[in-house]
């Protein structure tokens, strides 16, 4: 793929500890949905994924694709429309319902028996299942292994102190010959407390390097006018491909 870079080409910020104690609770994330504070949602889908999607899929059908912290990501329908099975997890029931409504998909809901008080929402077509629960409770549901993970807005949203647990959860869900597509953000963490949090290349190596080959495919300027309120003047997004060693 053109635009391929190694980590050596990518600017990193040295102060990686400044955000380590930042915490957002599940209730605070749910409040963001209730109050419409979801600027992280991309109505047109993620452009880097759109650019590389057919290359990643290689004409295959019937893949199992996992969306951690899925929100109402329109990319879930991209995969479903191509004949793949999509599973997502999201703490906000509102976000899940909005996905099905905005994509004009009928759905059913049922309790998750392994996690009392939670639900799974399933499209009538049967190829989209969205679990409304904590990502850390999900392994209790025995949802199986996945061929691909699309992680955009997930690792960068996880509290820094929970990253190791999160990464171990993701690795436990990966099947043979997996593709783990990971988007992270690069900005000066001394100027913005997050989320989204700054995730440097070294952190990706620490979390996934023992199991995965790690390759940065592309780096793009992601700075928008709204980011000025964060106190920053530049923001880059990096797309990584993690594969089985």
From Swiss-Prot:
Catalytically driven reaction(s): S-adenosyl-L-methionine + a thiopurine = S-adenosyl-L-homocysteine + a thiopurine S-methylether
Note whether S-adenosyl-L-methionine occurs among the keywords. yes
UniProt binding sites for S-adenosyl-L-methionine = 29-40, 69, 90, 134-135, 152
Is the keyword Transferase in the record? yes
Query: Which PROSITE patterns does the annotation name?
Result: SAM_MT_TPMT
EC numbers for this chain: 2.1.1.67
Q: What class of enzyme is it?
A: transferase
Task: List UniProt keywords, sorted A-Z.
Answer: Acetylation, Cytoplasm, Methyltransferase, Phosphoprotein, S-adenosyl-L-methionine, Transferase
This entry's Gene Ontology molecular function terms read: S-adenosyl-L-methionine binding; thiopurine S-methyltransferase activity
Q: Which GO terms describe its biological process?
A: methylation; xenobiotic metabolic process
Q: Give the sites modified to N6-acetyllysine.
A: 58
Residue sites binding substrate per the record: 40
Which SUPFAM superfamilies does the entry mention? Answer: S-adenosyl-L-methionine-dependent methyltransferases (SSF53335)
In the record, Phosphoserine modifications are located at: 14
Classify the source by domain of life: Eukaryota
Subcellular localization = Cytoplasm
Q: Which GO terms describe its cellular component?
A: cytoplasm
Q: How does it assemble?
A: Monomer.
Family (UniProt): Belongs to the class I-like SAM-binding methyltransferase superfamily. TPMT family.
Q: What is this protein called?
A: Thiopurine S-methyltransferase
Q: Which organism is it from?
A: Pan troglodytes
Its lineage opens with: Eukaryota, Metazoa, Chordata, Craniata, Vertebrata
Q: Which gene encodes it?
A: TPMT
């Amino acid at each position: 793929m053109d635009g391929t870079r190694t980590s050596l080409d990518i600017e990193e910020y040295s102060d990686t500890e400044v955000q380590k104690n930042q915490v957002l609770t599940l209730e605070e994330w749910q409040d963001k949905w209730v109050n419409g504070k979801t600027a992280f949602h991309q109505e047109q889908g993620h452009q880097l994924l759109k650019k590389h999607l057919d290359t990643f899929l290689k004409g295959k059908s019937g893949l199992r694709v996992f969306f951690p912290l899925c929100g109402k990501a329109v990319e879930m329908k991209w995969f479903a429309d191509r004949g793949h099975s999509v599973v997502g997890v999201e703490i906000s029931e509102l976000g899940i319902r909005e996905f099905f409504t905005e994509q004009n998909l009928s759905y059913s809901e049922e309790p998750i028996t392994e996690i009392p008080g939670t639900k799974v929402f399933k499209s009538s077509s049967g190829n989209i299942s969205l679990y409304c629960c904590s990502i850390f409770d999900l392994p209790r549901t025995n949802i199986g292994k996945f061929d691909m993970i699309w992680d955009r807005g997930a690792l960068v949203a996880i509290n820094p102190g929970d990253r190791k647990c999160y990464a171990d959860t993701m690795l436990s869900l990966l099947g043979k010959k997996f593709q783990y597509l990971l988007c992270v953000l690069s900005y000066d963490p001394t100027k913005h407390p997050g989320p989204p949090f700054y995730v440097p290349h070294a952190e990706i190596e620490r979390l996934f390097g023992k199991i995965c080959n790690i390759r940065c495919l592309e780096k793009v300027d992601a700075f928008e006018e709204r980011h000025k309120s964060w106190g920053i003047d530049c923001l880059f997004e990096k797309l990584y491909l993690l594969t089985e060693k």
